[in-house]
From Swiss-Prot:
Source species, domain of life: Eukaryota
Gene from which the chain derives: TMEM191B
Chain segments annotated as coiled-coil in the UniProt record: 52-206
Protein name: Transmembrane protein 191B
GO cellular component: membrane
A Pfam family hit: TMEM191C
Alphabetically ordered keywords of this record: Coiled coil, Membrane, Transmembrane, Transmembrane helix
Stretches the record annotates as Disordered: 101-120
Length: 346
């Protein structure tokens, strides 16, 4: 390829001016031909010299052109190698982008499913509570209408006839019932207001959970290498503990004879009090050996606190940060709901 194709400036072509014509060469033939023949031979020799100089100049230009061609070929080879490396790097980057997109889609699918399921469950609970509050409100309104009708009927009966004492007692009873109904109505309205506030809080919690899901999705998009980890749910209550307590109670109810028989059997198995003492010594040594790593760990932690108190404070600050508390609340919310519904012990 040439410099014009690559966009490089072409070297200037320098054409040297022809030299002065040489004096005519005098030979015996020119003497025989005379002055006219000598001039003719001189012009021929001058033309030959100019042609030879032009040929030399062309050879020099040819050498320069070949040298420049070699330089351009070398430059082209370097550019081709760099282009191949760039193409390979572009292919690697595209492959990496595809793998990251696959990983992001695989990680986002379960998170989306969990968020949708949680939002659906909360919406269902909110709908049920709204329906219950609406039914309770309708029942109270119907009861209030019935009492109002009874009050009007009793008022008409008292107005058109009846004993004065019975009228007063009936009026007092009706007034007391009316006050009671008004109190019940106010209490029902207060309960409805509290339920509405609770439903609003549930809606805010649902929006907050959706915002947390969106934040996790953004984190997966920005940092695809980093694995978005959802905090694990708290384990159910330990039933083995209850079983151990029951076994302890059963063991405490055994008879004294069984305990003595067990002690006698252990004595016979372990070879008497001396073997039992050796066994206790070995168990004590094992306890000491197990306690030593904990002691070293505590000393190293104390040394770290003495050297750099800011590290422990930063760790504690990260544990009590708003993000950690939000994730903990999001993780423990199903258990709290189970406890509120009476499915877990208080």
């Amino acid at each position: 390829m040439c410099r014009a194709t690559l966009g490089l400036p072409l070297p200037p072509i320098v054409i040297q001016p022809a030299r002065r014509s040489l004096p005519p060469i005098v030979t015996p033939a020119s003497r025989r031909l005379g002055p006219r023949g000598g001039r003719h031979l001189g012009s021929v020799s001058t033309a030959m010299a100019a042609t030879q100089e032009l040929l030399l100049q062309l050879q020099k230009d040819n050498r320069d052109g070949r040298q420049r061609k070699q330089e351009l070929e070398k430059l082209m080879r370097g550019l081709e190698a760099e282009s191949e490396s760039l193409n390979q790097r572009l292919q690697d980057l595209s492959e990496r982008e595809r793998s990251l997109l696959r990983r992001r889609s695989q990680a986002a699918q379960p998170l989306q499913g969990e968020a949708r399921e949680a939002a659906r469950e909360r919406a269902e609970r909110v709908r049920r509570r709204l329906e219950e509050a609406e039914r309770h409100k309708e029942d109270l309104e119907q009861h209030s209408r019935q009492l109002q009708e009874q009050w009007e009927e009793l008022s008409s009966q008292l107005f058109y006839g009846g004993e004065p004492q019975s009228q007063k007692s009936t009026e007092q009873q009706l007034a007391a019932q009316l006050v009671t109904l008004q109190n019940e109505l106010e209490l029902a309205e207060t309960k409805c207001a509290l339920q509405e506030e609770k439903l609003q809080q549930d809606a805010l919690q649902t929006a907050e959970a959706w915002a947390i899901f969106q934040e996790q999705t953004v984190v997966l998009q920005v940092r695809p290498h980093s694995d978005a980890k959802v905090p694990p749910a708290s384990p159910p209550p330990d039933l083995g503990r209850c079983d151990g307590q029951l076994r302890g109670v059963q063991y405490s109810t055994e008879s004294l004879m069984e305990e003595m028989a067990r002690a006698d059997r252990e004595t016979r198995l372990f070879g008497g009090p001396r073997a039992l003492a050796i066994r206790r010594c070995v168990l004590g040594a094992l306890q000491v050996l197990l306690t030593l790593p904990l002691l070293f760990l505590g000393l190293s932690l104390l040394w770290t606190v003495l050297l750099d108190p800011g590290a422990v404070s930063a760790w504690l600050w990260s544990l009590t940060s708003e993000t950690t508390l939000r994730r903990l609340r999001y993780t423990l919310s199903p258990l709290l709901e189970l406890r509120a519904n009476g499915l877990l012990p208080t």
